[in-house]
């Protein structure tokens, strides 16, 4: 699902005191490429997954399936209504986000700015924990960094509302806490290195380790939800910025930590991350390095291009069919990168 800016959208929402509902529309240019059954499946699924309350349906302007335009569009709208109601929704006036009030009247939800201050300190503490793993900061430096960063964040949040600050804090939480989670897991693997011939024991061990990694990562997810929790973000007038960075940064951050922790490319030297990076950039490049980087660049292109709020790498037809199968077979379709690549790789590493 992509996001398109609309002229006048923000002033209109503010003028309405955020008494507005989320709307979904299939882009006109995209709809020209779709057959009716393919467009049909999007509506109810999007309503459920994206909390949509208004479906803005544009008619097909070219006959399909041997039917004229009127018959095609009447059937199209009728089936959309049936699919939406089959998922438990009711047709009628759209509901809007509102906080509970004593008089029962509508009011947009905006938390007290002071509540964001402890969140900012907690998120920054996670970032400083990671930096300490790389640079071995003393307790004094850690406290100084936390105090300085916390004061700056608090001032922007309390005085200006700090939308950009909140988005930056959310980015830190979304990238750093999964990395901290994996550092715990890798240290756990290092502490219990032994040959376990029993396949069942390996699977059980890897399963609870994966569960631990998920739980630790959910700490960061909880911070993201808390720091971006208000009507503007619920309605996606403001959105989480940095989706592609959220894919790239954890890989880079865990790689830097791994180089530091296991003295990769250190040539026998025990030093901080600066030593490892200096040795890395002094490495002599060979043809096999270029070939490896080419493969890595292609993988990165697919990995990053398939993320974000905007169009990127096209999805193959086979994968679209697999998605449809998973949507029908499971309550919620899992992310392919997770259950086809990430989770199997975790079990192999464990």
Each language-model region and where it sits:
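Cytosolic-side membrane-insertion boundary helix
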Residues: 90-146
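Alpha-helical transmembrane segments of integral membrane proteins
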Residues: 123-350
């Amino acid at each position: 699902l992509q996001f398109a800016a609309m002229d006048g959208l923000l002033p209109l929402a503010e003028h309405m005191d955020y008494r507005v509902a989320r709307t979904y529309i299939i882009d006109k240019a995209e709809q020209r490429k779709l057959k009716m059954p393919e467009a049909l499946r999007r509506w109810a699924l999007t309503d459920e997954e994206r909390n949509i309350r208004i479906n803005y349906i544009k008619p097909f302007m070219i006959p399909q399936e041997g039917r004229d335009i009127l018959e095609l569009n009447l059937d199209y709208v009728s089936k959309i209504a049936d699919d939406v109601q089959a998922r438990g929704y009711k047709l009628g006036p759209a509901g809007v986000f509102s906080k509970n009030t004593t008089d029962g009247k509508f009011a947009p939800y905006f938390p007290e700015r002071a509540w964001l201050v402890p969140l900012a300190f907690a998120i920054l503490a996670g970032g400083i924990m990671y930096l300490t793993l790389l640079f071995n900061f003393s307790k004094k430096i850690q406290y100084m960094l936390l105090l300085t960063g916390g004061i700056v964040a608090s001032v922007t949040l309390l005085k200006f509302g700090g939308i950009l600050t909140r988005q930056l804090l959310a980015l830190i939480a979304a990238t750093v806490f999964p990395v901290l989670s994996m550092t715990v897991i890798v240290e756990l693997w290092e502490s219990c290195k032994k040959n376990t011939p029993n396949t069942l024991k390996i699977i059980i061990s890897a399963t609870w380790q994966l569960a631990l990694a998920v739980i630790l990562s959910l700490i960061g997810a909880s911070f993201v939800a808390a720091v971006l929790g208000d009507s503007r973000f619920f309605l996606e007038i403001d959105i989480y910025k940095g989706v592609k960075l959220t894919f790239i940064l954890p890989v880079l951050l865990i790689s830097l930590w791994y180089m530091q922790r296991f003295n990769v490319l250190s040539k026998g030297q025990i030093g901080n991350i600066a030593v490892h990076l200096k040795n890395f950039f002094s490495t002599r490049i060979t043809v096999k390095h270029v070939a490896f980087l080419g493969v890595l660049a292609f993988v990165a292109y697919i990995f990053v291009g398939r993320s974000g709020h905007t169009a990127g790498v096209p999805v193959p037809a086979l994968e679209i069919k697999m998605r449809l199968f998973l949507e029908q077979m499971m309550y919620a379709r899992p992310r392919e990168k997770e259950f086809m690549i990430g989770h199997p790789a975790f079990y192999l590493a464990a």
